[in-house]
């Protein structure tokens, strides 16, 4: 199930500074990054995760851009326009 894959990917991102750095890159392709890390997720899963965030959480996650990316960054502990990730 793709939702389980997304949750597993998020857990991996939280403990992997290399993945965090990849996700911080401008225009990061979350689906491709997840695939390279051995996870199978879809853009729809990212969009669904983003829809579960409040407006305030989405705003805190990033000042714009793709909400699927915002959801992953927010959930993985990455905030702000600079998308800084906590280790």
From Swiss-Prot:
Modified residues (2,3-didehydrobutyrine): 67
Function field: Lanthionine-containing peptide (lantipeptide) with unknown function. Does not show antibiotic activity against Lactococcus lactis 117 and Bacillus subtilis 6633 bacteria. Organisms that produce this peptide live in oligotrophic environments at very dilute concentrations, suggesting this peptide is not secreted to influence other bacteria.
InterPro entries for the chain: CHP03798_Ocin, Nif11
Keyword Secreted: yes
Keyword Secreted in annotation: yes
Cross-link Beta-methyllanthionine (Cys-Thr) per UniProt, renumbered positions: 78-82
Propeptide, chain numbering: 1-64
Induction: Down-regulated under nitrogen starvation.
Protein name: Lantipeptide prochlorosin 3.3
The entry's keywords: Secreted, Thioether bond
Entry comment on modification after translation: Cross-links are proved in vitro, when coepressed in E.coli with the ProcM lanthionine synthetase. The beta-methyllanthionine residues have a DL configuration (with 2S,3S,6R stereochemistry).
Domain of life according to the entry: Bacteria
Matches recorded under Pfam families: Nif11 (PF07862)
Gene Ontology cellular-component terms listed: extracellular region
Position(s), cross-link Beta-methyllanthionine (Thr-Cys): 75-85
Localization: Secreted
């Amino acid at each position: 199930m793709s939702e389980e894959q997304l949750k597993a990917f998020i857990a991996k991102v939280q403990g992997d500074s290399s993945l965090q750095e990849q996700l911080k890159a401008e225009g990061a392709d979350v689906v491709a990054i997840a695939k390279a890390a051995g996870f199978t997720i879809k853009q729809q899963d990212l969009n669904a995760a983003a829809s579960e965030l409040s407006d305030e959480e989405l705003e805190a996650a990033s000042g714009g851009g793709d909400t699927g990316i915002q959801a992953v960054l927010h959930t993985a502990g990455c905030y702000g326009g600079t998308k800084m990730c906590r280790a």
